[in-house]
Amino acid sequence: MINLAVVFLIIAVIAALLGVTGVAGMAAEMAWILFVIGIVLAIVFWVLGRRPPPM
């Protein structure tokens, strides 16, 4: 998930350098969304992984 966020961030930077601001904004927003989802999932799995298995 974080890998996709990095890819979209790179696309956003390249698009911004080329002057395509619409694509840059959209790619940056997608990178931010994927980054937040990745962090939230990492925290959820970290918390759930610490519980003992149900009996």
UniProtKB/Swiss-Prot annotation:
Regions that span the bilayer: 4-24, 28-48
Membrane topology designation: Multi-pass membrane protein
Keyword match Secreted: no
Record flagged with keyword Cell membrane: yes
Localization (cell): Cell membrane
Keywords: Cell membrane, Membrane, Transmembrane, Transmembrane helix
One GO cellular component term noted in the UniProt record for this chain: plasma membrane
Similarity comment: Belongs to the UPF0391 family.
HAMAP family xrefs: UPF0391
Name of this chain's protein: UPF0391 membrane protein Neut_2351/Neut_2360
Annotated organism of origin: Nitrosomonas eutropha (strain DSM 101675 / C91 / Nm57)
